[in-house]
Protein backbone atom coordinates (compact mmCIF):
# COMPACT_ATOMS: atom_id res chain seq x y z
CA UNK A 1 0.00 0.00 0.00
CA UNK A 2 1.00 3.63 -0.29
CA UNK A 3 3.05 4.85 2.64
CA UNK A 4 2.12 8.51 2.93
CA UNK A 5 4.97 10.76 3.96
CA UNK A 6 4.12 12.29 7.36
CA UNK A 7 4.12 16.06 7.36
CA UNK A 8 2.87 18.89 9.51
CA UNK A 9 -0.49 19.09 7.76
CA UNK A 10 -3.99 18.73 9.11
CA UNK A 11 -6.35 16.06 7.75
CA UNK A 12 -8.58 18.79 6.34
CA UNK A 13 -5.81 20.10 4.10
CA UNK A 14 -6.09 17.45 1.41
CA UNK A 15 -8.83 15.33 -0.06
CA UNK A 16 -10.26 12.90 2.49
CA UNK A 17 -8.53 9.54 2.94
CA UNK A 18 -11.52 7.63 1.57
CA UNK A 19 -11.50 9.66 -1.64
CA UNK A 20 -7.71 9.40 -1.82
CA UNK A 21 -7.61 5.62 -1.78
CA UNK A 22 -10.71 5.18 -3.94
CA UNK A 23 -9.07 7.35 -6.61
CA UNK A 24 -5.70 5.63 -6.69
CA UNK A 25 -6.51 3.62 -9.80
CA UNK A 26 -7.41 6.51 -12.09
CA UNK A 27 -5.52 6.44 -15.35
CA UNK A 28 -2.77 9.00 -15.89
CA UNK A 29 -3.79 10.84 -19.04
CA UNK A 30 -3.03 9.41 -22.47
CA UNK A 31 -0.10 7.37 -21.17
CA UNK A 32 -2.43 5.36 -18.92
CA UNK A 33 0.50 4.36 -16.72
CA UNK A 34 0.33 3.97 -12.96
CA UNK A 35 3.32 4.14 -10.70
CA UNK A 36 4.22 0.54 -9.94
CA UNK A 37 3.25 -1.12 -6.68
CA UNK A 38 6.94 -1.41 -5.85
CA UNK A 39 7.42 2.31 -6.43
CA UNK A 40 4.44 3.21 -4.29
CA UNK A 41 5.57 0.88 -1.53
CA UNK A 42 8.94 2.59 -1.58
CA UNK A 43 7.65 6.07 -0.81
CA UNK A 44 9.73 7.50 2.02
CA UNK A 45 8.17 7.66 5.48
CA UNK A 46 10.54 10.18 7.07
CA UNK A 47 9.48 13.71 7.92
CA UNK A 48 10.41 16.64 5.72
CA UNK A 49 10.73 20.29 6.78
CA UNK A 50 7.24 21.40 5.75
CA UNK A 51 5.42 24.22 7.47
CA UNK A 52 2.00 23.81 9.00
CA UNK A 53 -1.06 25.04 7.21
CA UNK A 54 -3.69 27.14 8.94
CA UNK A 55 -6.44 25.30 10.81
CA UNK A 56 -9.13 26.66 8.49
CA UNK A 57 -7.67 25.19 5.32
CA UNK A 58 -10.14 23.05 3.41
CA UNK A 59 -9.46 20.15 1.05
CA UNK A 60 -9.20 20.37 -2.70
CA UNK A 61 -10.90 17.65 -4.70
CA UNK A 62 -9.11 15.50 -7.21
CA UNK A 63 -11.51 16.90 -9.79
CA UNK A 64 -10.39 20.46 -9.02
CA UNK A 65 -6.72 19.58 -9.20
CA UNK A 66 -7.05 17.82 -12.54
CA UNK A 67 -9.60 20.10 -14.23
CA UNK A 68 -8.58 23.65 -13.19
CA UNK A 69 -5.15 24.24 -14.68
CA UNK A 70 -2.87 26.71 -16.40
CA UNK A 71 -0.98 24.90 -19.14
CA UNK A 72 -0.99 27.19 -22.17
CA UNK A 73 0.49 24.50 -24.38
CA UNK A 74 -3.05 23.08 -24.40
CA UNK A 75 -5.05 26.32 -24.37
CA UNK A 76 -5.55 29.42 -22.26
CA UNK A 77 -8.83 28.54 -20.53
CA UNK A 78 -8.66 26.70 -17.22
CA UNK A 79 -10.57 23.75 -18.68
CA UNK A 80 -8.47 23.49 -21.85
CA UNK A 81 -5.65 21.34 -20.45
CA UNK A 82 -8.02 18.65 -19.18
CA UNK A 83 -9.89 18.69 -22.50
CA UNK A 84 -6.88 18.77 -24.83
CA UNK A 85 -3.92 17.15 -23.05
CA UNK A 86 -4.91 13.63 -24.09
CA UNK A 87 -2.94 14.31 -27.29
CA UNK A 88 0.37 14.39 -25.39
CA UNK A 89 2.44 11.20 -25.57
CA UNK A 90 4.22 10.99 -22.22
CA UNK A 91 6.08 7.80 -23.16
CA UNK A 92 8.80 7.45 -24.29
CA UNK A 93 10.28 10.45 -22.46
CA UNK A 94 13.72 11.68 -21.51
CA UNK A 95 15.28 14.69 -19.79
CA UNK A 96 18.66 16.07 -20.83
CA UNK A 97 20.77 17.48 -17.98
CA UNK A 98 23.71 19.47 -19.33
CA UNK A 99 25.68 22.70 -19.10
CA UNK A 100 28.02 23.29 -16.17
CA UNK A 101 28.18 19.65 -15.08
CA UNK A 102 30.97 17.09 -15.05
CA UNK A 103 29.32 15.05 -17.79
CA UNK A 104 26.00 15.77 -19.54
CA UNK A 105 23.50 12.96 -19.37
CA UNK A 106 20.09 12.11 -20.77
CA UNK A 107 17.80 10.38 -18.27
CA UNK A 108 14.84 8.27 -19.35
CA UNK A 109 11.69 8.74 -17.29
CA UNK A 110 12.16 5.18 -16.08
CA UNK A 111 15.58 6.12 -14.68
CA UNK A 112 14.14 9.18 -12.96
CA UNK A 113 11.43 7.08 -11.34
CA UNK A 114 14.18 5.10 -9.62
CA UNK A 115 15.04 8.08 -7.41
CA UNK A 116 13.61 7.57 -3.88
CA UNK A 117 10.07 8.94 -4.09
CA UNK A 118 8.07 10.55 -1.32
CA UNK A 119 4.81 12.39 -0.92
CA UNK A 120 4.94 16.16 -0.41
CA UNK A 121 1.69 17.94 0.46
CA UNK A 122 2.24 21.51 -0.73
CA UNK A 123 0.27 24.67 -1.23
CA UNK A 124 0.12 25.94 -4.81
CA UNK A 125 -0.38 29.71 -5.21
CA UNK A 126 -1.06 31.04 -8.70
CA UNK A 127 0.02 34.57 -9.60
CA UNK A 128 -3.59 35.12 -10.72
CA UNK A 129 -4.77 35.00 -7.10
CA UNK A 130 -6.07 31.45 -6.63
CA UNK A 131 -4.58 28.53 -4.72
CA UNK A 132 -4.84 24.81 -3.99
CA UNK A 133 -3.33 22.17 -1.71
CA UNK A 134 -1.91 19.20 -3.63
CA UNK A 135 -0.28 15.91 -2.51
CA UNK A 136 2.56 15.47 -4.98
CA UNK A 137 4.74 12.40 -5.42
CA UNK A 138 8.33 13.17 -6.34
CA UNK A 139 11.93 13.53 -5.24
CA UNK A 140 14.17 16.44 -4.23
CA UNK A 141 15.57 18.22 -7.26
CA UNK A 142 18.86 18.50 -5.38
CA UNK A 143 19.34 14.74 -5.51
CA UNK A 144 19.45 14.85 -9.31
CA UNK A 145 21.67 17.94 -9.46
CA UNK A 146 24.19 16.54 -6.96
CA UNK A 147 24.52 13.40 -9.06
CA UNK A 148 25.61 15.57 -12.00
CA UNK A 149 28.59 17.10 -10.11
CA UNK A 150 28.01 20.78 -10.98
CA UNK A 151 31.05 22.92 -11.71
CA UNK A 152 31.86 26.06 -9.72
CA UNK A 153 30.39 28.11 -12.57
CA UNK A 154 26.90 26.69 -12.07
CA UNK A 155 25.07 29.69 -10.60
CA UNK A 156 21.66 29.16 -12.21
CA UNK A 157 19.55 26.33 -13.58
CA UNK A 158 17.40 26.68 -16.71
CA UNK A 159 14.42 24.43 -17.44
CA UNK A 160 12.65 23.78 -20.73
CA UNK A 161 9.28 22.24 -21.59
CA UNK A 162 8.66 19.94 -24.53
CA UNK A 163 7.92 21.73 -27.80
CA UNK A 164 5.71 19.54 -29.95
CA UNK A 165 2.85 21.49 -31.57
CA UNK A 166 1.39 18.33 -33.08
CA UNK A 167 0.58 17.18 -29.54
CA UNK A 168 0.40 20.54 -27.78
CA UNK A 169 -2.15 22.56 -29.77
CA UNK A 170 -1.57 25.75 -27.79
CA UNK A 171 1.93 25.94 -29.23
CA UNK A 172 0.41 26.58 -32.64
CA UNK A 173 -0.51 30.04 -31.35
CA UNK A 174 2.02 32.76 -30.49
CA UNK A 175 0.77 33.15 -26.93
CA UNK A 176 4.37 32.85 -25.68
CA UNK A 177 7.78 32.37 -27.27
CA UNK A 178 7.85 28.57 -27.25
CA UNK A 179 9.19 26.39 -25.78
CA UNK A 180 8.21 27.39 -22.26
CA UNK A 181 11.28 28.23 -20.19
CA UNK A 182 11.93 28.79 -16.51
CA UNK A 183 14.90 29.24 -14.23
CA UNK A 184 16.11 29.27 -10.64
CA UNK A 185 19.26 30.16 -8.78
CA UNK A 186 21.39 27.17 -7.86
CA UNK A 187 20.73 27.65 -4.13
CA UNK A 188 16.98 27.60 -4.81
CA UNK A 189 17.37 24.40 -6.78
CA UNK A 190 19.30 22.79 -3.95
CA UNK A 191 16.73 23.71 -1.30
CA UNK A 192 15.00 20.58 0.07
CA UNK A 193 11.52 21.96 -0.60
CA UNK A 194 12.11 22.06 -4.37
CA UNK A 195 11.07 18.79 -5.98
CA UNK A 196 10.62 17.13 -9.32
CA UNK A 197 7.10 15.69 -9.21
CA UNK A 198 6.21 12.54 -11.13
CA UNK A 199 2.80 11.95 -9.62
CA UNK A 200 -0.07 13.08 -7.44
CA UNK A 201 -2.47 11.10 -5.29
CA UNK A 202 -0.15 8.11 -5.63
CA UNK A 203 -0.54 7.90 -9.41
CA UNK A 204 1.53 9.12 -12.34
CA UNK A 205 0.91 12.75 -13.26
CA UNK A 206 -2.07 13.36 -15.52
CA UNK A 207 -1.02 15.07 -18.74
CA UNK A 208 -2.82 18.29 -17.80
CA UNK A 209 -0.78 18.53 -14.58
CA UNK A 210 2.59 18.32 -16.33
CA UNK A 211 3.21 14.67 -17.21
CA UNK A 212 5.46 12.91 -16.94
CA UNK A 213 7.72 15.14 -14.81
CA UNK A 214 7.45 18.71 -13.59
CA UNK A 215 9.05 21.12 -11.16
CA UNK A 216 7.31 22.09 -7.90
CA UNK A 217 8.70 25.11 -6.02
CA UNK A 218 6.01 25.82 -3.40
CA UNK A 219 7.21 29.23 -2.21
CA UNK A 220 7.00 30.74 -5.70
CA UNK A 221 4.04 31.56 -7.92
CA UNK A 222 2.81 28.56 -9.85
CA UNK A 223 4.16 29.56 -13.27
CA UNK A 224 7.68 28.96 -11.94
CA UNK A 225 6.86 25.25 -11.52
CA UNK A 226 7.47 24.32 -15.15
CA UNK A 227 5.69 21.28 -16.58
CA UNK A 228 6.59 18.42 -18.94
CA UNK A 229 10.33 19.05 -18.63
CA UNK A 230 12.72 17.85 -21.34
CA UNK A 231 15.87 19.79 -20.45
CA UNK A 232 17.64 21.01 -17.31
CA UNK A 233 20.71 23.14 -17.98
CA UNK A 234 23.14 24.44 -15.36
CA UNK A 235 24.75 27.74 -16.34
CA UNK A 236 26.69 30.75 -15.09
CA UNK A 237 24.22 33.46 -16.15
CA UNK A 238 20.61 34.14 -15.25
CA UNK A 239 18.42 32.31 -17.78
CA UNK A 240 15.66 33.90 -19.80
CA UNK A 241 12.22 32.85 -18.59
CA UNK A 242 9.01 32.82 -20.60
CA UNK A 243 6.73 35.16 -18.67
CA UNK A 244 9.57 37.55 -17.89
CA UNK A 245 10.37 37.74 -21.60
CA UNK A 246 6.70 38.31 -22.37
CA UNK A 247 6.26 41.09 -19.80
CA UNK A 248 9.16 41.86 -17.46
CA UNK A 249 7.17 44.62 -15.74
CA UNK A 250 4.59 42.11 -14.51
CA UNK A 251 6.58 38.90 -14.04
CA UNK A 252 9.95 38.99 -12.33
CA UNK A 253 12.62 36.32 -12.38
CA UNK A 254 12.21 35.40 -8.72
CA UNK A 255 8.40 35.49 -8.48
CA UNK A 256 8.34 34.59 -4.80
CA UNK A 257 4.86 34.68 -3.28
CA UNK A 258 4.72 38.08 -1.61
CA UNK A 259 1.48 39.66 -0.32
CA UNK A 260 3.26 43.02 -0.03
CA UNK A 261 4.18 43.26 -3.72
CA UNK A 262 1.13 43.55 -5.95
CA UNK A 263 0.87 42.53 -9.54
CA UNK A 264 0.50 45.76 -11.57
CA UNK A 265 -3.10 44.81 -12.34
CA UNK A 266 -4.30 43.24 -9.08
CA UNK A 267 -3.51 42.82 -5.40
CA UNK A 268 -1.52 39.85 -4.12
CA UNK A 269 -2.58 40.38 -0.50
CA UNK A 270 -5.27 37.70 -0.65
CA UNK A 271 -6.16 34.59 -2.61
CA UNK A 272 -9.13 32.40 -3.45
CA UNK A 273 -8.64 28.79 -2.46
CA UNK A 274 -10.37 26.70 -5.10
CA UNK A 275 -13.54 25.29 -3.55
CA UNK A 276 -13.96 28.15 -1.08
CA UNK A 277 -16.19 31.20 -1.34
CA UNK A 278 -14.32 33.69 0.84
CA UNK A 279 -10.80 34.87 0.15
CA UNK A 280 -7.97 34.23 2.59
CA UNK A 281 -4.83 36.22 3.32
CA UNK A 282 -1.78 35.27 1.30
CA UNK A 283 1.22 34.24 3.39
CA UNK A 284 4.78 35.42 2.68
CA UNK A 285 6.59 32.82 0.60
CA UNK A 286 3.25 30.96 0.49
CA UNK A 287 3.67 29.97 4.13
CA UNK A 288 7.22 28.62 3.75
CA UNK A 289 9.06 31.71 4.99
CA UNK A 290 10.62 29.88 7.93
CA UNK A 291 12.36 27.52 5.53
CA UNK A 292 13.28 29.76 2.60
CA UNK A 293 13.46 33.42 3.68
CA UNK A 294 17.16 33.02 4.38
CA UNK A 295 17.81 32.50 0.68
CA UNK A 296 16.92 36.14 0.11
CA UNK A 297 18.44 37.78 3.19
CA UNK A 298 19.53 41.32 2.39
CA UNK A 299 17.67 41.43 -0.94
CA UNK A 300 15.14 44.10 -1.81
CA UNK A 301 12.14 41.87 -2.52
CA UNK A 302 10.22 44.72 -4.14
CA UNK A 303 12.97 45.30 -6.66
CA UNK A 304 13.78 41.61 -7.04
CA UNK A 305 10.20 40.45 -7.44
UniProtKB/Swiss-Prot annotation:
Keywords for the protein's UniProt record, in alphabetical order: Metal-binding, Molybdenum, Oxidoreductase, Periplasm, Signal
Entry note: cofactor: Binds 1 Mo-molybdopterin (Mo-MPT) cofactor per subunit.
Instruction: Tell me which positions the record assigns to the signal sequence.
Output: 1-54
Q: Which InterPro entries does this UniProt record tie to the protein? A: MsrP, OxRdtase_Mopterin-bd_dom, OxRdtase_Mopterin-bd_sf
Q: What is its main location?
A: periplasm
User: What does the record say about PTM?
Assistant: Predicted to be exported by the Tat system. The position of the signal peptide cleavage has not been experimentally proven.
Q: Which cofactor does it need?
A: Mo-molybdopterin
**Keyword Signal, does the record have it?**
yes
**Where is the protein localized?**
Periplasm
Task: Cite the EC number.
Answer: 1.8.5.-
Q: Name one GO molecular function term.
A: oxidoreductase activity, acting on a sulfur group of donors, quinone or similar compound as acceptor
Q: What is this enzyme's class at the first EC digit?
A: oxidoreductase
Task: Quickly give the catalysed reaction.
Answer: L-methionyl-[protein] + a quinone + H2O = L-methionyl-(S)-S-oxide-[protein] + a quinol; L-methionyl-[protein] + a quinone + H2O = L-methionyl-(R)-S-oxide-[protein] + a quinol
What interactions and quaternary structure are annotated?
Heterodimer of a catalytic subunit (MsrP) and a heme-binding subunit (MsrQ).
Task: Note the HAMAP family from the entry.
Answer: MsrP
Family stated for the protein in its record: Belongs to the MsrP family.
Annotated function: Part of the MsrPQ system that repairs oxidized periplasmic proteins containing methionine sulfoxide residues (Met-O), using respiratory chain electrons. Thus protects these proteins from oxidative-stress damage caused by reactive species of oxygen and chlorine generated by the host defense mechanisms. MsrPQ is essential for the maintenance of envelope integrity under bleach stress, rescuing a wide series of structurally unrelated periplasmic proteins from methionine oxidation.
Supply the name of the protein: Protein-methionine-sulfoxide reductase catalytic subunit MsrP
What organism does the UniProt record list as the source?
Answer: Chromobacterium violaceum (strain ATCC 12472 / DSM 30191 / JCM 1249 / CCUG 213 / NBRC 12614 / NCIMB 9131 / NCTC 9757 / MK)
Amino acid sequence: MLIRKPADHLPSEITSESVYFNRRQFMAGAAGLLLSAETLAGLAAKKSPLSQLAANDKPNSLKDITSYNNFYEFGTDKSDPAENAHTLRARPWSVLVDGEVAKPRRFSIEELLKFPLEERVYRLRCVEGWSMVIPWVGFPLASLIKQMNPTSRAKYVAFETLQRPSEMPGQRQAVLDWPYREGLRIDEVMHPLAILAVGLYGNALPNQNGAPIRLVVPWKYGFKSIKSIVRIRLQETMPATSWNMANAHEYGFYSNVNPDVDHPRWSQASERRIGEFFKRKTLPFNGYAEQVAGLYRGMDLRKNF
